[in-house]
């Protein structure tokens, strides 16, 4: 298993309860596929450098995980089709 850092931005027009549900859903996607979440950071609502899908703000979430490729691929696939996540990136950390 490798170490990854995952950052994703949740659309700003969701309420707090919906935001928690999105975070929980994507954490479960990783853990059910064998990943171990070592650290989570909620950066809160921040201004974007440029407009994405007509949004100027977003809720930033950062995860540090140890995972196999299949867990990261499944997260990436579902993040791409989710309407709640406006941008995401997965970075493989050097050993």
Swiss-Prot record:
SUPFAM superfamilies found in the cross-reference section: Ribosomal protein S6
Membrane listed as a keyword: no
CDD domains assigned: bS6 (cd00473)
GO molecular function list: small ribosomal subunit rRNA binding; structural constituent of ribosome
Keyword Plastid on entry: no
Swiss-Prot/TrEMBL keywords: Ribonucleoprotein, Ribosomal protein, RNA-binding, rRNA-binding
Listed Gene3D superfamilies: 3.30.70.60
GO cellular component labels: cytoplasm; ribonucleoprotein complex; ribosome
Gene Ontology terms: biological process: translation
HAMAP family, alphabetized: Ribosomal_bS6
Family: Belongs to the bacterial ribosomal protein bS6 family.
Role description: Binds together with bS18 to 16S ribosomal RNA.
Record-given protein name: Small ribosomal subunit protein bS6
């Amino acid at each position: 298993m490798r170490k990854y850092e995952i950052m994703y931005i949740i659309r700003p027009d969701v309420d707090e309860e919906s935001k928690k549900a999105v975070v929980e859903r994507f954490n479960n996607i990783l853990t059910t596929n064998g990943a171990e979440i070592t650290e989570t950071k909620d950066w809160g609502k921040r201004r974007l450098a440029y407009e994405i899908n007509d949004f100027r703000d977003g809720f930033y979430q950062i995860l540090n995980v140890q995972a196999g490729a299949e867990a990261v691929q499944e997260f990436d696939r579902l993040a791409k089709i989710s309407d709640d996540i406006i941008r995401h990136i997965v970075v493989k950390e050097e050993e």
